């Protein structure tokens, strides 16, 4: 997919949930970021603008944030990594967008050196507190998610460092903010580099048993659904496969092998009211 096609896909995604979005300003942010990053490359060798586009896509597709957030996501690295200034972004776009971009840059500069549980919790609280506008931390988490998705281009040392940060800082914050799908993906991607053998073992098992687990999940879901109907309880039952890190953590906590973990399925019961 070309850069232009990726941008058009972003616009399509935003239009799907916010047709009144300011697409003129969003395009201006894209064009400004593309020009600012024009001489920069990712570790993969791709043009750097691929990254802000991907972050904006996550902000739109996963979080469905407003126009300002999309613009800030596209611009999130221009103050940190190019000659662009806060004043320039403020003048061309808005003071709010400039503050969002500067806020993301400030979070990027924080050094993570401690591993003490209490200090890690304080660091998580500090990150949230520093984000006077909650959209700052949402954009930063989206930034980290895309970086984790493309971590294969980094050195092994960098992979482990960023994965540990992600597991200890960003996944818990995502959980705290109710971003469950992003939290799961951050955990799985971190596990991939922190324990590649354990990760591959679990993923291979899930892939080999996928249809079996799907059938099992469907049968149990029907049983739960039927029983709740008998009780005249208005409800919705969701079933999903447990993600690799969830299984890995259970193996560790219960000191069991993968073959001893028999419940790869999780259920959520949403109860509206009794009739």
Predicted regions and their residues:
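Nucleic-acid processing machinery
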Residues: 1-20, 34-40, 49-62, 66, ...
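N-terminal glycine-rich anion-binding loops that anchor highly charged ligand groups
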Residues: 25-29
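Generic alpha-helical structural context detector
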Residues: 31, 57, 99-102
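N-terminal glycine-rich flavin-associated loop
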Residues: 72, 76
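Hydrophobic or amphipathic alpha-helical targeting/insertion segments
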Residues: 77, 88-103
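Active-site-proximal helix-loop-helix substrate-binding element of RNase H-like nuclease domains
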Residues: 98-101, 107-113
């Amino acid at each position: 997919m070309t850069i232009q096609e990726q941008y058009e896909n972003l616009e399509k995604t935003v239009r799907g949930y916010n047709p009144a979005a300011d697409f003129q300003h969003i395009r201006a942010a894209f064009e400004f970021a593309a020009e600012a990053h024009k001489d920069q490359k990712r570790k993969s060798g791709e043009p750097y603008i691929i990254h802000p586009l991907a972050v904006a896509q996550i902000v739109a597709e996963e979080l469905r944030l407003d126009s300002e957030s999309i613009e800030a996501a596209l611009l999130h690295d221009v103050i940190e990594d190019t000659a662009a200034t806060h004043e320039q972004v403020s003048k061309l776009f808005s003071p709010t967008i400039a503050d969002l971009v500067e806020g993301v840059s400030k979070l990027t500069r924080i050094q993570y050196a401690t591993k003490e549980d209490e200090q890690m919790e304080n660091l998580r609280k500090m990150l949230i507190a520093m984000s006077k506008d909650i959209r700052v931390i949402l954009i930063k988490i989206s930034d980290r998610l895309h970086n984790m998705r493309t971590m294969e281009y980094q050195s092994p040392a960098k992979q482990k460092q960023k994965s540990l940060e992600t597991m200890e800082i960003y996944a818990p914050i995502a959980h705290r903010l109710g971003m469950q799908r992003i939290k799961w993906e951050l955990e799985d991607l971190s596990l991939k580099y922190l324990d590649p053998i354990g990760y591959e073992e679990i993923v291979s098992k899930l892939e080999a048993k996928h249809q079996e687990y799907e059938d099992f999940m469907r049968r149990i879901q029907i049983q739960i659904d039927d029983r709740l109907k008998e009780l005249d309880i208005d409800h919705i039952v969701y079933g999903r496969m447990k993600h690799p890190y969830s299984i890995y953590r259970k193996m560790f906590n219960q000191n069991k092998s993968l073959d001893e973990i028999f419940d790869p399925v999780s259920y959520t019961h949403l109860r509206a009211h009794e009739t």
